[in-house]
Amino acid sequence: MKTIQKLFEHLNWANQSILEKFQNVEIGEQQLRLFTHILYSEQVWLTRLKGMDSSQMPIWSDDDITVCAKLIKQNEENFKTFLAEIAKTKTDLNNLITYTNSSGKEFMTSIRDILTHVALHGQYHRGQINSRLRVDGIDPVNTDYITFVR
């Protein structure tokens, strides 16, 4: 559980690092769209982890940077609460969650695997954001885990 909590600390730090970059440079539509996708996907997965219906929730959006800042704060608080609760109740991370994806297909996945996916999904898209920043002549944001833990 400690490793998962650390991965989410990294996720929050990395999201905040991207946000700070976006607040200080002119970014393209693609970068912002990828970032909102990360943040809305985090909300979708948390909703699924709580056993609630996520079928009407967006996973892509054209929101602005102000909305991103709010989503980062909400997601951080909500995941901290969720992780603290499953640690407190000693919930088995191998328990399966049944959910329906955005295409309407039903799946069963362990809590552990969903949490791992959320942490890795964001890192994948932050890499895409950094690639697009480079193309635009903007220095990328170092969101490497090792940089976070130093």
Feature-to-residue mapping (PLM):
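Helix-adjacent hinge/juxtasegments
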Residues: S55-N95
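Active-site metal-coordination segments of metallo-dependent hydrolases
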Residues: M1-F8
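Short, contiguous alpha-helical
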Residues: F8-S61, S102-R150
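Short, structured helix-loop boundary elements
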Residues: M1, Q31-L32, I65, A69, ...
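Cysteine-centric segments in proteins
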Residues: T98-T100
